[in-house]
Amino acid sequence: MKQLLDFLPLVVFFVVYKMYDIFYASGALIAATGLAVAMTYFIYRKVEKASLITFIMVAVFGTLTLAFHSDLFIKWKVTVIYALFALALLGSQWFMKKPLIQKMLGKELILPDLVWNKLNMAWALFFTACALANIYVAFWLPQDVWVNFKVFGLTALTLVFTVLSVVYIYRHLPREQK
C-alpha cells in the first residue's frame, strides 16, 4: 500500500501532462504528493523523512514552475532530489557511525559492515547517476522525452537497482535469515 501511495503522484503527473501540459501537471503533482503524504500519515501515523523532503521539494519547485511559468524548475527538482539523497548517503558514510542504508534496514537485516558500506555507496552512486542523467535528458532533449524518462525510465532504473540490491543483500545474509 505504501509503495502505491508513493507511486500515485507520478501517475497523476504523467496523466495530467498528457491531457494538458507541464504546468497543470506540476500543480497536480503538488496536490497529489501532498495527498499521498497526508494519506500515509493517516494510515501509518508516520511519514518517512525522504517522503517529507520529496514533498517539500515538489512544493517549492512546483510552485516556482507555476509562478514563473517555466518548466526549468520542475526539471531541476528531479536532479536536486536525487543529489540530496546521494549527499545524505555519502555524508552518512563519511561522518556518521553507520551508513544511512544500515540505519534504515539494519533492524531487519544482519549484514557485515563492509556490505552495508558497499550498499550505501552503490545507492549514492546510483542517485548521482540519476541526477546527471536527468540533467542531460531534461535540458538537451524535448520535454515529452523528459516526461517519459522521468516517469518510466527513472522508475524502471530504480526498480532494477532495487532488485540488484536485494540479490546482493541475499548473497550476504546469514543462513538463518535467508
From Swiss-Prot:
The keyword Ribonucleoprotein does not apply. Keywords: Cell inner membrane, Cell membrane, Membrane, Transmembrane, Transmembrane helix. It holds the Pfam family IspA. It comes from Photorhabdus laumondii subsp. laumondii (strain DSM 15139 / CIP 105565 / TT01). It is a multi-pass membrane protein. InterPro entries: YciB (IPR006008). Disulfide bonds: none annotated. It is found in: Cell inner membrane. Its main location: membrane. Belongs to the YciB family. Plays a role in cell envelope biogenesis, maintenance of cell envelope integrity and membrane homeostasis. The chain crosses the membrane at residues 22-42, 50-70, 72-92, 121-141, 149-169. NCBIfam families: ispZ, PRK00259.1-2, PRK00259.1-3, PRK00259.1-4. It comes from the Bacteria. GO terms for cellular component: plasma membrane. This is Inner membrane-spanning protein YciB.
